[in-house]
Each structure stands twice: as structure tokens, then as C-alpha cells.
């Protein structure tokens, strides 16, 4: 069995952003204690059942850094003793306002080697609308302290399509990210999810038009690459060698184990998940079955999110035959519109194709 990825969900936040639809909430110390105990239990139990190793650990949320640093280290050290290889990539998502000196001391001790920091925007007005407290000075301080702690693999989150955002304000955010020296950016187009404050206010906020957001996306891709930060997935950019190993497992349709409320797993061709219910997870209930995974359609859908696209080599290695001719013919219909390219028998989307990825990919693979 190849090395899997390990994801641990920490559903706690001090405050919820108005656009966020992830499973997260404020919690008291007793709830956090019981939750961490349940995570440690599931790490032990799953290691006995699976008999495999993981070469990536991603602790996401929520805001994992709102946990006491000792709790985080307990989780990471347990993951090391049960699953992780010696060279594992260990990522912790964090909010700049929840990072004190003890955090950096502890994560350095337990060999965290990657941080993902929520910036979203370097523009004060945009951050206020997004409910983000941390400004440029706080984020730069965190980046500097992380590097002093020996963590140089740092990612910043950036958001496009923010109310009031312009190409000029986006460029200012990108310039800040570039000047901070981080080697990775995750840049997402804001999606208005139901059951969020943004959804209820959608007619009252000055969202950029779809055309303006598309122009900003294309500008961002070109601007970052001019500065050596290369696009490798629809929403992800990195200095070569600093791509997220964990997230590449998802896009390569590789196996991963998810632990925690709302966490999903893909193992043995089956997709399972824990519901968005913390007490369900704490009580030790089993994962629910989502269905089969890893078929040709899913593999192609995920591969086409990558800049490298769907290659004959990777497809053949997985399914022992070439990409179906029908799929290649469908892709060629979009090639003439500049939305994808078919080279060496493979398929990859152009940047304009990425903007329409949901519809283009579904048409190609169906």
C-alpha cells in the first residue's frame, strides 16, 4: 500500500467569517479537551486497522491554532507515533491573532514544517468586510517568527471577488505576499454559500462582476508567474518545489484518511465521512459511507484541475489503458475556443478554461 495522506479537522474558531461554510464554531475548554481525546483515540484505532504510513499531515479547520499549543503537539506526536513517515510534510492552518510565542516554540519542538496562514486581503476595507482582523503587520510578524522557528514552507490565503475589490487592490495584496517571501499562495474566488451572512447580504454588497473577477484572476496568474510563483492548480501557486504535497494527493486521486467531525476519507476505493456533528465524532461512532471513488471519471475530473492536466502516462498507470477517444474528441471541441489543449494525447485546461472549469470538465468527462 502506498503512503496515504492524513487530514485532521479542528472545528474551532474564535469568530466565524461571514463567508465561511466550513464546520466550525466557538467551544469551551471542556469541549476542546474531549475533542482532542477523541482525535487521539481515532489515530490509535485507525493505525491498528489500516497498517499503513502517511507522508503528509494536514491539520485544518476551523482554526487549529486556537487550540492550546500543548493540544496541537499531542495530536502531532500521536500522528507521528501511529502514521507519519520521517520525511512527512506537516501543515497547520493558523490565524495570525492566535499565534503567541508558545505556539512557535511548540510547533518547532514537534517538527511542524509548513504553515498555512489566512490573509485573504492586504486591503483594510476588504478585510473588514471579510471579518478578518489580522492586517499586514500581523501577518508579516507571523511569517518572520515562523522563519525564525525554522519553518520556511509557508502559504498565504488570498481571496478574489471580494466586495469592493479592484485589480489595483488585488495587485497590492499580491505585492505584499511577494515581498513577504512566502513560497506558496492559495488564491480562491469567493463563492457565496447558502446559510452564511454573505448569502443573506448578497444583494447589498458591492461584489465585482463576473467579468471583472475573471480579469483579476487572469491578471493574478500572469503577475505571480512573472515573480516566479508558478500556477500548479486552479487556485494554487508555488515557487517550484514548494507545492502542497498533501493537496496534491487529493488532485492525484490518492488515498487519505480524515479524522474529526466533518472529515472525509478515501481508502480502498470507498469514500466515507463523519457528519458535521461534534458529539457524533466524540462518541466514537463510525464513519458514514459516501460511495465508491477512484473511477475513471473522478480521476480525470481531479487531474484536470492541475496545470499539468490529464496525461496519458498517469491515466495508463492507473487504469492500464489509454484515455478514451470519446473524451479526447470532447476536449478538442473546447480546444478551438482556447479553453483547453490536447498535447501528446493528454488534456489540460488553459487559464480561461480554469475560469469555466466546472462546466468544461463535466462536458469533457461525460
Where are these regions (language model features)?
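Immediate flanking context of iron-sulfur cluster ligation sites
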Residues: 2-10
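C-terminal scaffold of the Radical SAM
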Residues: 3, 24-45, 52-321
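Local cysteine-cluster metal-coordination motifs and their immediate loop/turn environment
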Residues: 11-22
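C-terminal alpha-helix/helix-terminus motif
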Residues: 47, 158, 360-364
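Short amphipathic alpha-helical interaction segments
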Residues: 321-333
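A short, conserved structural fragment
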Residues: 335-345
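Minor-groove-contacting beta-hairpin "wing" of winged helix-turn-helix DNA-binding domains
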Residues: 346-350
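Short, amphipathic alpha-helical interaction segments positioned at domain boundaries
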Residues: 352-366
Amino acid at each position: 500500500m502506498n503512503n496515504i495522506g492524513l487530514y485532521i479537522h479542528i472545528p474551532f474558531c474564535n469568530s466565524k467569517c461571514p463567508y465561511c461554510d466550513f464546520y466550525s464554531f466557538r467551544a469551551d475548554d471542556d469541549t476542546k479537551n474531549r475533542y482532542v481525546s477523541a482525535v487521539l483515540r481515532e489515530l490509535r484505532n485507525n493505525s491498528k486497522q489500516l497498517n499503513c504510513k502517511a507522508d503528509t499531515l494536514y491539520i485544518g479547520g476551523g482554526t487549529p491554532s486556537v487550540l492550546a499549543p500543548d493540544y496541537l503537539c499531542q495530536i502531532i506526536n500521536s500522528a507521528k507515533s501511529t502514521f507519519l513517515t520521517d520525511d512527512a510534510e506537516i501543515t497547520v492552518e493558523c490565524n495570525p491573532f492566535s499565534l503567541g510565542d508558545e505556539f512557535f516554540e511548540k510547533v518547532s519542538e514537534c517538527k511542524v514544517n509548513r504553515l498555512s496562514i489566512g490573509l485573504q486581503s492586504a486591503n483594510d476595507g476588504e478585510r473588514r468586510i471579510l471579518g478578518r482582523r489580522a492586517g499586514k503587520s500581523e501577518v508579516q510578524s507571523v511569517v518572520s517568527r515562523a522563519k525564525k522557528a525554522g519553518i520556511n514552507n509557508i502559504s498565504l490565503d488570498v481571496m478574489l471577488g471580494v466586495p469592493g475589490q479592484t485589480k489595483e487592490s488585488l495587485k497590492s495584496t499580491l505585492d505584499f505576499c511577494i515581498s513577504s517571501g512566502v513560497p506558496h499562495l492559495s488564491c480562491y474566488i469567493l463563492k457565496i454559500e447558502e446559510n452564511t451572512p454573505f448569502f443573506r447580504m448578497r444583494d447589498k454588497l458591492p461584489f465585482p462582476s463576473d467579468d471583472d473577477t475573471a480579469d483579476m484572476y487572469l491578471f493574478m496568474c500572469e503577475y505571480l508567474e512573472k515573480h516566479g510563483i508558478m500556477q500548479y492548480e486552479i487556485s494554487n501557486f508555488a515557487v517550484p518545489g514548494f507545492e502542497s504535497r498533501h493537496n496534491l494527493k487529493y488532485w492525484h486521486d490518492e488515498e487519505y484518511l480524515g479524522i474529526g467531525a466533518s472529515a472525509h476519507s478515501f481508502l480502498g476505493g470507498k469514500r466515507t465521512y463523519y457528519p458535521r456533528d461534534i458529539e457524533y465524532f466524540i462518541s466514537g461512532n463510525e464513519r458514514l459511507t459516501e460511495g465508491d471513488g477512484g473511477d475513471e471519471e473522478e480521476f480525470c475530473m481531479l487531474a484536470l484541475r492541475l496545470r499539468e492536466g490529464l496525461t496519458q502516462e498517469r491515466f495508463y498507470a492507473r487504469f492500464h489503458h489509454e484515455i478514451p477517444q470519446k473524451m479526447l474528441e470532447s476536449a478538442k471541441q473546447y480546444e478551438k475556443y482556447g479553453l483547453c489543449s490536447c498535447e501528446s494525447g493528454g488534456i489540460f485546461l488553459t487559464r480561461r478554461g480554469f475560469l469555466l472549469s466546472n462546466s468544461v470538465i463535466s462536458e469533457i468527462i461525460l
